[in-house]
Amino acid sequence: MSSSAQHDQFRPRRSRLRRRALPAAAVATMSGLTLGALPGVAAATQHQSRPAAVQRSSRPAIAAPGAVAYVYGNKPSVTNYTPKRVDSFNSSGERIHIHRSSTGKYQVTFFGLGPFASQGTVDVTAEGLMPEQCNVVRWVPDSTGANLLVKVDCWTVAGAVLDSPFMAAFTSGGSTTGTTDFVWAYNPTAHSYTPQAAYQFNSSGGTNTIQHLGAGRYEVFLPGPVVADGSVKVTAYGSNANFCQVDQWIAASPGQNVFVDCFSPAGTPANNRFTMTFTASDDLLGDGASFSGYLWGNDPTSSTYTPAAQYQFDTAGTTATVTKLPPNPGEGQASWPNEADGDQGDQQGTAYGSTPAHCIIDGPIGINGNEAGDVFCFDTSGNLLDTLYTTQWMVG
């Protein structure tokens, strides 16, 4: 952990704002990847020439989600607190509370969302600067039925419980302006199955299915999304220290095949439950947020680059860039120009590829009129690692 030891896990986010001008975007390279390694490459050229309006018109009208929420757990050692409003959101308009029951174990209460607590999905990402990870343990209604409880566990990459900042996001299911599909993969050993209807959503009206390809390896089929781009977020589910990441996603005919890999803390393939969300021209909540964006960090060794065009999006319609944060490997800052929404909202992130890795976030933050989000990636020993990733942000 020598390269990451200098980080201060609990340094306030706001003090980390890097007030420097971002370098001009460079043409992205593929870091030596073959075309087959690119997500959705089978139809990427076709998609680039297809107007977004045509892409959306082929999708049946889907209602907006009934409930969305997110939270920034920024006081990891405090037993009870109310998170900052600027970093959290509850579509019910009621309050949010976080309770720490023991080291690394948290319960988030979203008041007023109980009627939606037995459906939907939850995304979680560790936040900060240290090698760590956070998983979703479960989401359920409380004893009154009025409120939504989301349980989160956090760990070191070695698998020891750890007090860690985190970000968590919930949606009950829906999509308005683009494509947002998800599954809760609850049966890690079944060869092939259909996830429970309440815990999956398909914006084209289809039924998602999951296939177990081998130890720790899964294929999620999302029938219908007529896109060849988008972004994927994966979160390990359960009370163990295993972790999951996106290996790749490929446009089907029509639809998406999303490949997910899960590992033990040592990096050995391990069967595990997970949640997975795919979004294209939308955000992870599916509510068509006024401010949101995503990108695929596909060239982690370059000092600055423009991510692959078909795998980035933002509501301002501009072009995102990624800047490496020297002197360490594994540190990058994603920036969406003219999305000056300040230090608020939710950011998520996931390591990409078949090599086991952990990617955490530190954002979103406002820098020089841009919206930015830092991403830090580590290997299973806790060393900073240049690896590919996906990241998403949105403001409720």
Please provide the spans of the model-predicted regions.
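Secretory targeting and sorting signals
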Residues: 2-45
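Extracellular attachment/recognition segments
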Residues: 45-396
